[in-house]
Swiss-Prot record:
Binding-site residues for Ca(2+) 2, renumbered to this chain: E14, D17, D19
Binding, Ca(2+) 1: T13, E14
Species lineage: Eukaryota, Metazoa, Chordata, Craniata, Vertebrata
PTM summary: The C-terminal domain displays an autoproteolysis activity and a cholesterol transferase activity. Both activities result in the cleavage of the full-length protein and covalent attachment of a cholesterol moiety to the C-terminal of the newly generated N-terminal fragment (N-product). This covalent modification appears to play an essential role in restricting the spatial distribution of the protein activity to the cell surface. The N-product is the active species in both local and long-range signaling, whereas the C-product has no signaling activity.
A GO BP annotation: smoothened signaling pathway
Gene: dhh
Database matches in Gene3D superfamilies: 3.30.1380.10
Protein name: Desert hedgehog protein
């Protein structure tokens, strides 16, 4: 993210779900999923953000 968008930070909005906000079989209940966005919340970046996550091994 730093290399792609120098002034933008990665935001983790949720990693573990205790409140039941995700689908029943979500990996959030096992602590194996995260919800992420960018600090500027620009939805146009989400496709590239997903590609960067895959390249990083997620």
């Amino acid at each position: 993210v730093m290399n792609m968008w120098p002034k933008v930070k990665l935001r983790v909005t949720e990693g573990w779900d205790e409140d039941g906000n995700h689908f029943e079989d979500s990996l959030h209940y096992e602590g194996r999923a995260v919800d992420i966005t960018t600090s500027d919340r620009d939805r146009n970046k989400y496709g590239m953000l997903a590609r960067l996550a895959v390249e990083a091994g997620f």
